[in-house]
Regions:
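Canonical Rossmann dinucleotide-binding motif of NAD(H)/NADP(H)-dependent dehydrogenases/reductases
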Residues: 2-38
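Hydrophobic structural elements of the Rossmann-like NAD(P)H-binding subdomain
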Residues: 11, 89, 141, 183-186, ...
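Catalytic loop of short-chain dehydrogenase/reductase
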Residues: 13-20, 93-128, 136-178, 190-192, ...
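A short hydrophobic alpha-helix cap/turn motif
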Residues: 29, 83, 134-135, 174-179, ...
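A glycine/serine/threonine-rich, flexible loop-to-helix segment
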Residues: 49, 178, 188-213, 253-261
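Conserved mid-core segment of classical short-chain dehydrogenase/reductases
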Residues: 52, 63, 67-72, 76-81, ...
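Short-chain dehydrogenase/reductase
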Residues: 75, 123, 127, 169-170, ...
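C-terminal helical subdomain
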Residues: 121, 185, 204-239, 244-248
Length: 261
């Protein structure tokens, strides 16, 4: 029997074929789940619909997660289509490019609010809207990054947002524990996604990660999707409120390994 046989999963944040959310959708489908996906905006629709069709995914909905009415509308459609769901994946993060370069203290008030709303509150809003639809024993997963706990030049306000997202994960895990629903986060290494390309000097960060991580390998979207599969399957039935690092061990390092002269 496949790990997600008979499970119903809804995945938010598919943008293109390089998205972490898209990798999750593929892995979950291959693991036996019935999958639905959501995207943001008309431009992305043209990219996402063909991807969804390629794996036989019929539930494809647009959702502006900055609007509660959009979130609630997708929840209503999901209830009509699925009845109940077992898995909710939140793979959404955004900050204006202008906020992801230069000193952090130059973060604008509007930029701070935007990053927190899209990257953090959206997870809370989705959890609240889908709570009535979640089966007992279900799972919610979000995506974070090491910049939540360690300074990452140019990551700036997104680091603050990811720290808040991780705290939100723990509070949601407490709230949903009474319903036997698990809530966890995955902290992946840098990946060449659409969102990552907005971070200033990302190429340097990407190379430095590979050099410093104990495994000396960058992370792929499939690596992250496989971790999500574990967290959303019964294999992790007693795991909640955790931040699972999928980063080739980068998070354990204090200083880079000395390079022989």
């Amino acid at each position: 029997m496949k790990l997600l046989e008979g499970k119903k999963a809804l995945i938010f944040g598919v943008a293109n074929n390089r998205s972490i959310a898209w990798a999750v959708a593929q892995v979950f489908k291959n693991a036996g789940a019935e999958v639905g996906v959501s995207y943001a905006g008309e431009i992305l629709r043209r990219r996402v619909e063909p991807l969804a069709e390629s794996i036989g995914c019929d539930f494809v909905e647009e959702c502006d997660v900055s609007k509660d009415e959009d979130i609630n509308a997708v929840a209503d459609k999901a209830k009509e289509y699925f009845g109940k769901i077992d898995i909710l994946v939140h793979s959404i993060g955004f900050a204006d490019r202008s906020e992801l370069r230069g000193p952090f203290y130059n973060t604008s008030r509007a930029g701070f609010h935007l990053a927190m709303d899209i990257s953090v509150y959206s997870f809370i809003g989705l959890a609240r809207a889908f709570q009535p639809l979640m089966n007992e024993g279900g799972a919610m997963v979000t995506m974070t990054y090491h910049g939540s706990t360690k300074v990452t030049p140019n990551y700036n306000v997104m680091g603050i947002a990811k720290a808040a997202l991780e705290a939100s994960t723990r509070y949601l895990a407490f709230d949903f524990g009474k319903e036997k629903i698990r809530v966890n986060a995955i902290s992946a290494g840098p990946i060449r996604t659409l969102a990552a390309m907005g971070v200033g000097d990302f190429k340097t960060m990407y190379k430095a990660f590979e050099d410093m991580a104990p495994l000396h390998e960058n992370v792929t979207t499939e690596d992250v999707a496989n971790a999500a599969l574990f967290l959303c399957s019964d294999m992790s039935a007693r795991t909640t409120g955790e931040i699972l690092y999928v980063d080739s061990g980068y998070n354990i390092m204090g200083v880079p390994e000395a390079v022989p002269e």
